[in-house]
Amino acid sequence: VFAVVPAENASGVTQRYQPLMDYLSKELGVKVTLRIAADYAAVIEGHRSGNIHIGEHGPSSYVRAWTVTNGGVEPIGTPTDSNGVTGYFSVAYAKASAAGAKLEDFKGKNLCLVDPNSTSGNNVPLFAMNKGGIDPEKFFAKVTNAGSHENAVMAVQQGTCDVAFNWWNSEDDSNLSRMVNKGMVKKEDFKIVFRSERIPGSPYIMISSLPTDLKKAITSALMDMQTRDKSVLDKLTDGKSKGFAAMKHSDYQVTIDLQKFVDDLRKKRGS
């Protein structure tokens, strides 16, 4: 069973990932099914219970899964961008017509985060705001979790949020560009008012208790996807990836530190 943390709506997830299920089923000789998860926690819990064997995560949800399974999951690799580089960014979107040009200009407005286990939609923003002296609970009128990256953008579009955090690779490779391609929004309606430093790439991971030969087969199926069936990779990444780059747990040390920071922040706030 394969699951992915929610970035887009269920039909979008199915269209993007079903070719991967067919490809993995063929390569592994065993049927791989797609589980649509309601939130990040459902995928993490699925790994812990052993019901979800392979998953695509953001760095923070991988680290959370690694923590709750006592190291019972391992990263395989992450898709590179069109230049063969791994990693991505957290950005904040506002309406193009909004008065502010940077995050600090949106005092007293409504902020949308994505999910408590989202890296670009929660942890990086909280860290960056803290560093910039912003306490979101006091600085903004209201802070809400949109639930997915698409929902966060839609909230800005509909005016329920003035600013929303999201993942972003480049001008033509982001959640926003995917939504534009699907006809959901217009690019010119939005502007970026914050961009983070580069975040480690979102890993595909598997539970460590799988048989060794199966783990090897899963790894080679993903790492060699570019040569074995490029159409699957293109579907996953909107044709914006040069293939997978191998990742190991130590590559996520910065995310582990970030997770600790956010957890400590929550404890301080008593939430």
Spans of features found by a protein language model:
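An extracytoplasmic/periplasmic, membrane-proximal ligand-sensing/linker region
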Residues: 1-3, 8-19, 199, 206-271
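Extracytoplasmic small-molecule ligand-binding "clamshell" domains
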Residues: 1-63
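Solvent-exposed coil/turn segments that connect beta secondary-structure elements
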Residues: 7, 57-61, 81, 95-98, ...
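Extracytoplasmic/secreted proteins, especially bacterial periplasmic and envelope-associated proteins
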Residues: 12-19, 23, 42, 46, ...
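Short helices/loops that flank or line small-molecule/ion binding pockets
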Residues: 41-55, 68-69, 88, 104, ...
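A structural signal for short loop-to-beta-strand junctions that line the ligand-binding cleft
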Residues: 72-85, 191-195
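Flexible hinge/capping segments at coil-to-helix
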Residues: 94-115
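Pocket-lining segment of extracytoplasmic ligand-binding domains
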Residues: 110-213
